[in-house]
UniProtKB/Swiss-Prot annotation:
Extent of the signal sequence: none
UniProt feature coiled coil, ranges: none
Species, as recorded: Mycosarcoma maydis
Entry keyword annotation includes Heme: yes
Protein name as annotated: Lanosterol 14-alpha demethylase
Principal location: membrane
Length: 561
């Protein structure tokens, strides 16, 4: 059978090369020639089709690319923002590019974001875009593995746990974790023998974010487990949260095998916690008899509209989703905030003065941080976090799958509009993916003065785009409470519409308290030049070789003992 197949292949090669100078060459030479020429032929045909075959008039223009299937993947992957800005200059705010066989239509600007985030669920869905990435990590029966109406109910349940009452408890817990980390971590212990230390701030923030999140949202069992097996489970599960699994899911990779094993073990870990708490009756409220103010305590109490309580599996997988989604984004944002402040040490001193003015105890010292003051009385600290998110939104691209042809409003793009056809517009075909990139608007020089500069004070000036970005927002209840639908804003670091991040307030609280605690204890500056962004992971991180900052304790800093 093999011999017959080889003979047929050789015969075919002989026919192909019969009229060429390679007619008398060996089969191996002919085979190699074919392997070289076929890709070249594919490139030629791909280029010819783009030059000779016109794109339908009502379809967005397609970004020119040489290699079929791969398309613009390399160009986009190296620097998405450079890709977006250059394509906008050439094609406008709406254009399509090929990404590893998928057709991605990009809609830029505030109106483009509004199109993506507020399109009807019957036309575009997030679950069809992301479930193959998230479900193996989060688990079944939650988030994008369930119908959208169920997911909206689950978001409502999580929102219950993100209450002001819980936030009041979380502030001192976060402070305690930060101070304990500085006391016990080996890198900081070097301060006992020298005046300054150099710290990889991304590594430190990755550790602090999970420590503070586990102490507050995740619960005491998770916090205790961070020093044991849970930390390894998290690492293995996290290894499956990679771009390759978004593009080509379920490859037989060692990292995916580890991911799947870790998901089962972590799921069982949480299910055991839920079972023990329910057995002990520790599920009455956020201030129940066990004194728990974490998310598990809140979820145990919740019921769907049909009266069914959440199962242990659902709670376990919602907790995993909460852990994984918040860890990456907050680690990145807090790291960028520290690095941006390190590039402007004078702002660190302004933050310290703000702490002295707001938290003075009247005797030359500082009161402990509290929720009410953090929420209402530290405008510069809030502005630092907002400005960091403006320049460094964690996600550079947000996608939806187009289920049915989607009309682009004429106000966004009208390639065929005439006096006789004033309403003509692009139509994004079914089967495309539609992509928003809010970060483009957030650094657009047509919107922001000195758009590439880190200037928290822009948020304190009532006349700037920054100060006005939150005004006049429409609100809608998608099933988990009233939220802003204001996707027309040029500032959308947490998204908009039905899939807007519900952890926004906790993120501001967590990052703000960590920053304030460090500002009270340290001054810092960059160890080298400001790092470039690294676009190779799921969120935009600072490049590994530029994360070092130099910390110097304040002479008047609080004692950590």
């Amino acid at each position: 059978m093999v011999a017959s197949s080889s003979s047929a292949t050789a015969s075919l090669l002989d026919q192909l090369f019969a009229l060429t100078p390679l007619a008398d060459s060996s089969a191996w030479i002919k085979t190699i020639t074919v392997l070289v020429l076929l890709p070249l032929l594919a490139v030629v045909l791909n280029v010819a089709s783009q030059l000779l075959l016109a794109t339908p008039k009502n379809h967005p223009p397609v970004v020119f690319h040489f290699v079929p299937v791969i398309g613009s993947a390399i160009y986009y992957g190296i620097d998405p923002y450079k890709f977006f800005f250059e394509c906008r200059e050439k094609y406008g705010d709406v254009f399509t590019f090929v990404l590893l066989g998928r057709k991605i239509t990009v809609a830029l600007g505030p109106k483009g974001s509004n199109l993506v985030f507020n399109a009807k669920h019957q036309q575009v869905t997030a679950e069809d875009a992301y479930t193959h990435l998230t479900t193996p990590v989060f688990g079944k029966e939650v988030v994008y593995d369930v119908p959208n109406a169920v997911f909206m109910e689950q978001k409502k349940f999580v929102k219950v746990g993100l209450s002001i009452e819980n936030f009041r408890v979380y502030v001192p817990q976060i402070v305690d974790e930060v101070r304990e980390y500085i006391k016990s971590d080996a890198r900081f212990s070097a301060l006992k023998t020298r005046k300054t230390i150099t710290v990889d701030i991304f590594q430190a923030m990755s550790e602090l974010i999970i420590l503070t999140a586990s102490r507050t949202l995740q619960g005491k069992e998770v916090r205790q487990g961070l020093d044991k097996s849970f930390a390894q489970l998290y690492h293995d599960l996290d290894s499956g949260f990679t771009p390759i699994n978004f593009v080509i899911p379920n490859l037989p990779l060692p990292s995916n095998f580890k991911r799947d094993r870790a998901q089962k073990k972590m799921s069982q870990f949480y299910q055991d916690i839920v079972a023990k708490r329910r057995a002990a009756g520790a599920s009455t409220s956020a201030d129940d008899a066990s004194g728990e103010n974490d998310m598990i305590a809140a979820l145990i109490e919740q019921k769907y509209k049909n009266g069914r309580a959440l199962s242990g599996v659902e709670i376990a997988h919602m907790m995993i989703a909460l852990l994984m989604a918040g860890q990456h984004t907050s680690s990145a944002t807090s790291s960028w905030a520290f690095l941006r402040l390190a590039s402007r040490p004078e702002i660190i001193e302004e933050l310290y003065e703000e702490q002295l003015n707001v938290y003075s105890d009247g005797h030359g010292g500082l009161r402990e941080l509290d929720y009410e003051t953090q929420k209402t009385s530290v405008p510069l600290l809030d502005a630092v976090v907002k400005e960091t998110l403006r320049l460094h939104p964690p996600l550079h691209s947000i996608m939806r799958y187009v289920k049915s042809d989607l009309a682009v409003p004429p106000t966004l793009s009208s390639p065929t509009s005439t006096k006789s056809e004033p309403d003509a517009h692009y139509v994004i075909p079914k089967g495309h993916y539609i992509m928003a990139a809010p970060g483009v608007s957030q650094v657009d020089p047509q919107i922001w003065k000195s758009s590439d500069q880190f200037d928290p004070h822009r948020w304190l000036d009532a006349t700037t785009a920054a100060a006005m970005q939150d005004s006049g927002e429409d609100k809608q209840d998608f099933g988990f409470g009233m939220i802003s639908t204001g996707a027309n804003s040029p500032y959308l670091p947490f998204g908009a519409g039905r899939h807007r991040c519900i952890g926004e307030q906790f993120a501001y609280l967590q990052i703000g308290v960590i920053l304030a605690t460090f500002v009270r204890i340290f001054k810092w500056h960059l160890d080298s030049k400001f790092p470039d962004p690294d676009y190779q992971s799921m969120v935009v991180l600072p490049s590994k070789n530029g994360c070092a900052i130099v910390l110097t304790p304040r002479a008047e800093s609080l004692h950590l003992d």
